[in-house]
Amino acid sequence: MLRRIAGIPHPYISRVSNATTRRRCNATRFSVQILRSQLRWLGHVLRRPQNDPLRLVVFEPDTELCPRLTNTGRKRVVGRPRIDWAQTLIEMFCNFSQVSRPRMLEIVSDKQRYHFIVERLCSQTALIS
């Protein structure tokens, strides 16, 4: 679809790489767009009140950034990841921005600052891949 938008003729579609097409259209990778959306949604969830149902689904009540099933004493079913989706995003954000988990809550509460850090993370990810 992006090749058609870029005006690449049909006989040459298979000869033009994805990177060239993205460069011509000034578009980003889908994986970077998905990461940006996931991190922004995580920030939205973390800005919710502690007893909000959405936050309770992602995190256990009365714990700071402690995803469910980590301290329950149960093992995960065979084939399931050891850490869940929210935990993965939190670790990625903390490693990139070099902040601790409690400090992350302060950063998330400032929406503009959090969005700036997310954009920086996504631009770094786009350069790497």
What are these regions (language model features)?
Residues M1-S129:
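Short linear motifs embedded in intrinsically disordered, charge-biased segments
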